[in-house]
Regions:
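P-loop NTPase motor domains
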Residues: 1-88, 103
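Conserved ATP-driven motor cores of ASCE-family P-loop NTPases powering translocation/secretion/packaging/pilus
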Residues: 80-128
């Protein structure tokens, strides 16, 4: 690859869909998705601040299915609290909130606190059923 095929820096300029697909049976390269997500959040925050007075012209929505299987995104607890003002949002999709706690430890509660809404589709976590 001799040139940038992803053009991540154009996200937020126009409507675009980017699909990051990983194996659900082999986690060898999950760290690549985690690094890419981290870089993407940072790139778009910087772009919003530097080029668009703090807000991207086109809202960027991250649909993070199987979020626990991506691995830990560095500083995600801080990012999730600040991206909203820059016209970005993240939908974190988990099988159970315990997965989030296993990966993010104490920061899991901060991540949950910064979620505007929670959709619970059933499960056996009795403690979360009372939310």
């Amino acid at each position: 690859m001799s040139y940038d095929e992803l053009e991540l820096d154009t996200l937020g300029d126009r409507k675009t869909a980017l699909f990051l697909i990983m194996s659900d049976t082999d986690d060898t390269f999950n760290f690549v998705i985690s690094i890419l997500q981290s870089q993407l959040f940072n790139l778009l925050c910087d772009k919003a601040d530097d080029e668009y007075n703090g807000k991207l012209p086109v809202h960027v929505r991250f649909l993070l299915d199987e979020f626990a299987n991506i691995g830990q995104i560095p500083r995600f607890d801080k990012l999730i609290a600040t991206i909203r003002s820059r016209e970005m949002s993240a939908s974190i999709i988990l099988q159970s909130q315990s997965q989030l706690k296993a990966i993010y430890k104490d920061a899991a509660e901060i991540i949950l606190d910064n979620a505007d809404s929670t959709l619970f589709l059933g499960g056996r976590e009795i403690g979360r059923a009372h939310v």
